[in-house]
């Protein structure tokens, strides 16, 4: 065996094991002494010990640290520091900051306006259909059906305020009882959360941002769904919301007040009313079975009218049909009387784009729907870009610490409740929970606000939107004051009950965990986000609606097995994660099921093949179609062919393969070869030279 190579300028390490004959400690120190004796230089000559060559046969995988995808990203500031700028640069930077602030406020203004126009577009497309849902008051006595109708109507009109006002009108007209209206209010609470979920889809381009944004949006959905699943059976059994609100209304003598204050609408209404104006009374009239309203258009044409009452002579079949005996006479063979007639005279038309087009409501709604979605998407992209350029370095650190930091011990538990108050106050200012949560979604996506902090803010928005409804109820006329106030209070106490269920105790904050799980799935399979929207906001409510119309026997016969299977799967999943040993070996995992029943990979392949033929055409059309293609096919480079998805997957698989770390090689020569410092063919030469 050849002697070990000696390296200059190396110290022997006494802690290292040096291989010798028969596995004993070699006499390296003696050799070192001899070498030192023969060395003519005064500088000490040292050696490095090399571990045995056979030790390189077993390579050790270095454990890779997996970053938590929910950690907030560090927004690095790559620009020039303020202290390093000259006077001209500081002035230019100052005006750039002012310009970015103006642009941010401008895009935020158009973002809010696009949400308002989006709501109007949905009302034009599905407003009359929503009114017809309420027209059959006999089926509203079914609480489950009332819940589903509340969800569908609010999704169609994109406004919980509109659906709530319809319910108030029906209750004040004695077409609906408060008891039957409470499930509808619960459904409206669910339906209004679809808006910020749609907004989250606009951040689908970046996987990490989409994971956070979609989870931040759907935490609102899960809170509402879980609250309904628990509180609806409790309300049906005890009617506690109806009893509490009735006691409150009867205990206080409320008087009619002034109209609810318009805060944000004062700024947005001058612009939105130039686009379109709607006559929202038509939906309420359809809900109250007014046949004349079915032929009316929701697009408002005349904004200024004059109503005049006059008396005219009319003929009647007999004197018994006269309005009054003193106002009845006979002229030959005809009987005459005087009747009060109301004339409505149109004076001035409204000033908006569609006032003179005379298009059907569906056409106007479709146009506004497409345009509002384009503006919404564009504004959101620009808001994210501007925030990303502003919130960097020290600014981002200060903002994230201010928003996400808890109070010092022992008052840390108060931080979340303060966030609830902030969310309620901000929602009261903007007068819409959809606007507040939709504005919150991009901030969650870019990593300024954590999911844990966004959760109490969202709960506060639920409270804030009910306070606006209470103020609006206090401004109602005398005949509708009592019913509208009781319904608004039902909405308020429903959200308070939900907060008491899913917030005070940390382990009960299930919406956060469920939203994070859905965010992880949607980030990996981005088409699943659209699937979630369709299933939870359309297919499930429509299925329950159809089964309810078929009768309670059909509903129970189909619903009970489905609920039983869901509960069984959840219990089995809980046992698999907590104590799998109590289960049979076959049930300790889901491998006994076919792959398509336990994984989304087969479904992802089907969706990719289905969208592959449309991908190239979609990418060549426009940027908006390109984003839709990215959403469906999970492809961030959609301006290429469908092969880019496969390339991306191969690249990700290549990154997932554990790489042997150079430090784990036992032989330093092999380690240097792995690092590329020494070619493999020259390793022997280097050892000889040493």
Swiss-Prot record:
UniProt record, GO biological process: in utero embryonic development; intracellular phosphate ion homeostasis; phosphate ion transport; response to estrogen; sodium-dependent phosphate transport
Keywords of the record: Cell membrane, Disease variant, Disulfide bond, Glycoprotein, Ion transport, Membrane, Sodium, Sodium transport, Symport, Transmembrane, Transmembrane helix, Transport
NCBIfam families (alphabetical): 2a58, Na_Pi_symport
Main location class: membrane
Biased composition (Basic and acidic residues): 30-40
Underlying gene: SLC34A2
InterPro entries, per the entry: Na/Pi_transpt
Site feature (Breakpoint for translocation to form a SLC34A2-ROS1 fusion protein) residues: 126-127
Disulphide-bonded residues: 303-350
Subcellular locations according to the entry: Apical cell membrane
Induction or repression: Down-regulated by EGF.
Name the UniProt record assigns to this protein: Sodium-dependent phosphate transport protein 2B
Family of this protein: Belongs to the SLC34A transporter family.
Glycosylated residue positions: 295, 308, 313, 321, 340
This protein's GO CC annotations: apical plasma membrane; brush border; brush border membrane; membrane; plasma membrane; vesicle
Pfam family name, one: Na_Pi_cotrans
Species of origin: Homo sapiens (Human)
Role played: Involved in actively transporting phosphate into cells via Na(+) cotransport.
Membrane topology, Extracellular segments: 122-135, 234-362, 429-485, 547-552
Membrane topology: Multi-pass membrane protein
Cytoplasmic side: 1-100, 157-212, 384-407, 507-525, 574-689
Transmembrane spans: 101-121, 136-156, 213-233, 363-383, 408-428, 486-506, 526-546, 553-573
Disease link: Pulmonary alveolar microlithiasis: Rare disease characterized by the deposition of calcium phosphate microliths throughout the lungs. Most patients are asymptomatic for several years or even for decades and generally, the diagnosis is incidental to clinical investigations unrelated to the disease. Cases with early-onset or rapid progression are rare. A 'sandstorm-appearing' chest roentgenogram is a typical diagnostic finding. A chromosomal aberration involving SLC34A2 is found in a glioblastoma multiforme cell line U-118MG. Results in the formation of a SLC34A2-ROS1 chimeric protein that retains a constitutive kinase activity.
């Amino acid at each position: 065996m050849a002697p070990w190579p000696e390296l200059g300028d190396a110290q022997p390490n006494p802690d290292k094991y040096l291989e010798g004959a028969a596995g004993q400690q070699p006499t390296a120190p003696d050799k070192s002494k001899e070498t030192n004796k023969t060395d003519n230089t005064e500088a000490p000559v040292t050696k490095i010990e090399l571990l045995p060559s056979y030790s390189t046969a077993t390579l050790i995988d270095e454990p890779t640290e997996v970053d938590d995808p929910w950690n907030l990203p560090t927004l690095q500031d790559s620009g020039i520091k303020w202290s390093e700028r000259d006077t001209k640069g500081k002035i230019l930077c100052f005006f750039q900051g002012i310009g970015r602030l103006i642009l941010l406020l401008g895009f935020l203004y158009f973002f809010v306006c696009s949400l308002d126009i989006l709501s109007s577009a949905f009302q034009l497309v599905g407003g009359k259909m929503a009114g017809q849902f309420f027209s059959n008051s006999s089926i509203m006595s079914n609480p489950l059906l009332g819940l589903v109708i509340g969800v569908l109507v609010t999704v169609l009109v994109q406004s919980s305020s509109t659906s709530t006002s319809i319910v108030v009108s029906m209750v004040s007209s004695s077409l609906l009882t408060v008891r039957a209206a409470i499930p509808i209010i619960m459904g409206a609470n669910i339906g209004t959360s679809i808006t910020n979920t749609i907004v989250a889809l606009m951040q689908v381009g970046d996987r990490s941002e989409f994971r956070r944004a979609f989870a931040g949006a759907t935490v609102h959905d899960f809170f509402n769904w879980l609250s309904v699943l628990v509180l609806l059976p409790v309300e049906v059994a005890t009617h506690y919301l109806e009893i509490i609100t009735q006691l409150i209304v009867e205990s206080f003598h409320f008087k009619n007040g002034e109209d609810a204050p318009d805060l944000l609408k004062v700024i947005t209404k001058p612009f939105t009313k130039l686009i379109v104006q709607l006559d929202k009374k038509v939906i309420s009239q359809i809900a109250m079975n007014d046949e004349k309203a079915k032929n009316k258009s929701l697009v408002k044409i005349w904004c200024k009218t004059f109503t005049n009452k006059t008396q005219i002579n009319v003929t009647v079949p007999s004197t018994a049909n006269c309005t009054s005996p003193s106002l009845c006479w006979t002229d030959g063979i005809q009987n005459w009387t005087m009747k009060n007639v109301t004339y409505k005279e149109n004076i001035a038309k409204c000033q908006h784009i569609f006032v003179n087009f005379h298009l059907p409501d569906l056409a106007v709604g479709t146009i506004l729907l497409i345009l509002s979605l384009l503006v919404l998407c564009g504004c959101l992209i620009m808001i994210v870009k501007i925030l990303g350029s502003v919130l960097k370095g020290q600014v981002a650190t200060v903002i994230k610490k201010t928003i996400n930091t808890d109070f010092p011990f022992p008052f840390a538990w108060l931080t979340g409740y303060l966030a609830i108050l902030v969310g309620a106050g901000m929602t009261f200012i903007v007068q819409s929970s959809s606007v507040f949560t939709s504005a919150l979604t991009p901030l969650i996506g870019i990593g300024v606000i954590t999911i844990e902090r966004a959760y109490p803010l969202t709960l506060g928005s639920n409270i804030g939107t009910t306070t606006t409804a209470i103020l609006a109820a206090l401004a109602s006329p005398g005949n509708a004051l009592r019913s509208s106030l009781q319904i608004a209070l039902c909405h308020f106490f429903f959200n308070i009950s939900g907060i008491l269920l899913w917030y005070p105790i940390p382990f009960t904050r299930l919406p956060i965990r469920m939203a994070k799980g859905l965010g992880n799935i949607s980030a990996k399979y981005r088409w699943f986000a659209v699937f979630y929207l369709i299933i939870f906001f359309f297919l499930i409510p429509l299925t329950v609606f159809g089964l309810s119309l078929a009768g309670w026997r059909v509903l129970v016969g189909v619903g009970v097995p489905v609920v039983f299977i869901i509960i069984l799967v959840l219990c089995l999943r809980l046992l698999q994660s907590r104590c799998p040993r109590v289960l049979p070996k076959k049930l300790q995992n889901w491998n006994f099921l076919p792959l398509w029943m336990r994984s989304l990979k087969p479904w992802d392949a089907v969706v990719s093949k289905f969208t592959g033929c449309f991908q190239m055409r979609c990418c060549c059309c426009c940027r908006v179609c390109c984003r839709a293609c990215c959403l469906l096919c999970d492809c961030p480079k959609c301006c290429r062919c469908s092969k880019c998805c496969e390339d991306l997957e191969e690249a990700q698989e290549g990154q997932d393969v554990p790489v042997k770390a150079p430090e784990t090689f036992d032989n330093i020569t092999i380690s240097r070869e792995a690092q590329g410092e020494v070619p493999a063919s020259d390793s022997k030469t280097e050892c000889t030279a040493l």
